[in-house]
Amino acid sequence: RNGIKVEQALDDFQITAAQDYRSGRTLKKTFIQGTYIVTTQQPKHLLINTIMARNLEIEDSVMYDMATWSAPLAYNLDAYSTTGGYTVKTKQVSQEVAFNGSVINNEAQYAYVIDWSQRNAPQALAQLWAKKYNVRSAFEPFYVGDQTFSAGTLIVLRGRNLERKDQMDQEIKAIAQNAGVEIMGFNSGRVMAGMDLANGRNVPIKQPKVALLVEPPFSTYTAGQIYFLFDWQTGLPIDRIKATALQQSSSPKFGGRSRSVDLKDYDVLILPNGGSGLSELFKEEALDEIKDWVNEGGTLIATEGAASFFTKESSDFTEISLKKYPKDSSLMARSLPYDQRTAYEGKKRIPGTALNAKIDITHPLAFGLKAELYTLKFGTDVLLSNAALETVGSYGTLNQLNVAGYASPENLSHLAGNTFAGVVSMGRGKVVYLIDNTQYRMFWMGPSRMMQNAVMQIPGY
């Protein structure tokens, strides 16, 4: 699309000085056949460096948007760079790489299985739900031959879907093609290692009824990103509800004229990034109603500013505490000339910086992810560890935390080792905290599986 030449290796090859994007270390590395190669020895080298370089030099302390635009980081890819030479035969990639779906054993006698680590697995689940299939989620990884199926893998048992037995094979084939996933058919429920397909610990997951709050005090940007993620990319319908509807007993749905809003109609409530108006919207009575709804089995997903608000200090909604960065009351801050304050404050901000994160991939919120993740950080809010908090995503160690972009040593020390993604059980329901934007501008997509899991997997667990 942008006139950049991309090549693919026809053989295995080795680079003696390859810099690992994740750790920053330079090492000898062997790459397998099929590896994609983008050389900077081409006319679009400036564009390539802008979107592919691990880090860019930043001279100013004040930035408009974000401090890194590295595509390998944004999509959480395993990537390396080198300034040295290498030798390998290549072919030019002339067409966009498509996710071609397929079914292995299309007349399976027992079950069909979709590995949840596939990029488009959530789309497949949405399509299964649309056709009223009963689906289970694998509680832990299992192994068949030399293939690993990750935790969260979708299991469609033939015996649990007898009403669709006549059309199942054709519908499964169509879903594989439409979603662009590989589906494997099983003639038996037995596996080589791990829990068998019909094991009771593999959890039934049903299509949730999902509501997304929109309009002030919530960010229209974040709300739009979340809606786009589900409505367009995943194909899972969600209702947009005006935030003010929570303050009224009978108010129209977003885009509707007569239907009223009742939290009991929903299984999942998503709160986008919100600002100072949250305390006005969520007064004691509203908080009590939401707490009752969660206790009865609802899943509350609070993101960014809304996640910060639903902590003990701001709303007393849970026992989870927010670690706030201490206010600068130094003599220097108080005595700065007016024309120096913007630059001084800019150095204390985190303007969209890529940080290394550790992920608990055994938790349903992280199903399908790798154990390491690049999260995009704005601001300094972070959750403190708590016995009630199931920590799923935490910032890395101080010496490896900052991958790309700017963050002061004080900010990095403040964040290191603390939690940005976690889950709290409350009665029969759950509160999901996502301090960082998991799908920023639908560009920083590496963490987006957490949002999909929060909606599609968490309610079943």
Which residues fall in each region the model found?
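Intrinsic-disorder/low-complexity accessory segments
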Residues: 1-461
